Regions:
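Short, solvent-exposed loop/turn elements at beta->coil junctions and helix N-caps
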Residues: 18-21, 94-99
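Short, well-ordered alpha-helical segments
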Residues: 33, 38, 46-93
């Protein structure tokens, strides 16, 4: 099994899909944290996306909505980690679900930790 490592820094807050962050030592685990958002596709977007789906190709309205939703879920994840006293998040994952065929739920979750830079 290969472990994929991705690290982003949103406002200098280390976030990784791996269970550790290179260059940092985990000194305390704060626990499970998440960020959630639910977005409506809107009638106009549904109609244009429906028409576009007839001819195939990327549905740009949905791509934009999903990118915005992912960013919002990630920001909420960071806020939750800060609330529990974390300064980084490891083991980050995303999940998405349809709700009633008109809304999209995006969940970002992981483990809040306290890290310090290794010397």
């Amino acid at each position: 099994i290969y472990e994929v490592f991705i690290m982003v820094s949103v406002n200098e807050f280390p976030i990784a899909t791996a269970n550790e962050i290179p260059g940092f030592k985990i000194i305390e685990t704060k626990g499970f944290v998440y960020g959630l958002t639910v977005r409506s596709r809107g009638v106009g977007g549904q109609v244009s996306a429906g028409l576009r789906s007839l001819v195939g190709g990327e549905i740009k309205e949905y791509v934009s909505m999903m990118e915005d939703s992912r960013d919002e879920a990630l920001e909420r994840l960071i806020e939750h980690a800060k609330q529990v006293g974390g300064n980084a998040i490891v083991a980050v994952r995303f999940d998405s679900n349809d709700i009633s065929n008109v809304m999209q739920e995006i969940l970002a979750y992981g483990t809040a930790v306290v890290v310090e830079k290794e010397e």
